[in-house]
Amino acid sequence: MRGGLWQLGQSITRRLGQSDKKTIVRRCYASEADLKKTVLYDFHVAHGGKMVPFAGWSMPIQYKDSIMDSTINCRENGSLFDVSHMCGLSLKGKDCVAFLEKLVVADVAGLAPGTGSLTVFTNEKGGAIDDSVITKVTDDHIYLVVNAGCRDKDLAHIEEHMKAFKAKGGDVSWHIYDERSLLALQGPLAGSTLQHLTKEDLSKMYFGDFRIIDINGSKCFLTRTGYTGEDGFEISVPSENAVDLAKAILEKSEGKVRLTGLGARDSLRLEAGLCLYGNDMEQHITPVEAGLTWAIGKRRRAEGGFLGADVILKQIADGPAIRRVGLFSTGPPARSHSEIQNEKGENIGEVTSGGFSPCLKKNIGMGYVKSGLHKPGTKLKIVIRGKTYEGSVTKMPFVPTKYYKPA
């Protein structure tokens, strides 16, 4: 899981500062020739992007700015990320909502057209297969984006259940948007910058909203969402127009929005207290344990009907045995798999993500601890490279979120 980043050499790992190496580069391939490239690959290289293996793709981990500077600039101005390695797809048909509700915990039927939500795909034991942002475009059209590292298993899972659903007469079909690229524009200048490139009034578009609109002359799927805790958008654009759109965004921001890589993206999501699948969520972790009970709609709690509902609903009623928590710690930054102990030195859990916060100038992390030891202020110890350091449980997000919502 973490081996690929070590192969990059000490020059890059030093520039990564204190970020958790495992969370950045995953599922590396044997050679550069094995890696997929987004349509912006040459654009990244021309702008100084340092390309690394990530989930089978060659992606920029950073540009000329340090990861710390890029993180802070996103919070103060804005960042543009290439997230085309992620997989966008649509489900269509009069039964697409009923079909999706068998696989995810969200109240999809309760979403108004043009709105969306974070949700979790679950397995029969209630564990998380992946997390995803889903949008109800219309009552018979759902748009969703799944993680790059989970693409193959997610698509196989959806296809398997779709075949069974259709065999019983269900009306649902799907399309995978391999012909599109995905850009994420994040930060306080995201709205004003993008407004220069569309006639759509973005001030009326709030967090979680979705539109199909013209941006810079291209038909785009626009979602007001992101992975940083800041206001921002994810823009699905025809691949042949992706480079032109990236150039236009950077130009309209007058240099304040900067290209940003995976390193800062990881720092930003950690500061925002957001899960990284494969670290903070796995197939043996339920949404309740991960602190995502809020994503399980009220109707779904009453009716169930999704995979693993019996396990998940019992955890909601009785409480889970473990819980995801935020962590502060002394010493070097905690890493994934670092042991968490109580004050007596007894094992109570494990760190899943950790790093140095560029904005808070202190070590932060996430992990799982036994229920009862999850309350903010609980003192604990973290074992890093055989040495024990003081730590404590804290609330998340570490940095306040700034999602654009109605006043």
UniProtKB/Swiss-Prot annotation:
GO terms for molecular function: aminomethyltransferase activity; transaminase activity. GO terms for biological process: glycine catabolic process. It comes from the Eukaryota. The keyword RNA-binding does not apply. Pfam families: GCV_T, GCV_T_C. Residues 1-29 form a transit peptide. It is found in: Mitochondrion. Its EC number is 2.1.2.10. It catalyses: N(6)-[(R)-S(8)-aminomethyldihydrolipoyl]-L-lysyl-[protein] + (6S)-5,6,7,8-tetrahydrofolate = N(6)-[(R)-dihydrolipoyl]-L-lysyl-[protein] + (6R)-5,10-methylene-5,6,7,8-tetrahydrofolate + NH4(+). It is an enzyme of class 2 (transferase). Keywords: Aminotransferase, Mitochondrion, Transferase, Transit peptide. The keyword Transferase applies. One of its GO terms (cellular component) is glycine cleavage complex. InterPro entries: GCS_T, GCST_C, GCV_T_N, GcvT/YgfZ/DmdA, GcvT/YgfZ_C, TrmE/GcvT_dom1. Substrate binds at E234, R265, Y403. Belongs to the GcvT family. The glycine cleavage system catalyzes the degradation of glycine. The glycine cleavage system is composed of four proteins: P, T, L and H. This is Aminomethyltransferase, mitochondrial. The lineage of its organism: Eukaryota, Viridiplantae, Streptophyta, Embryophyta, Tracheophyta.
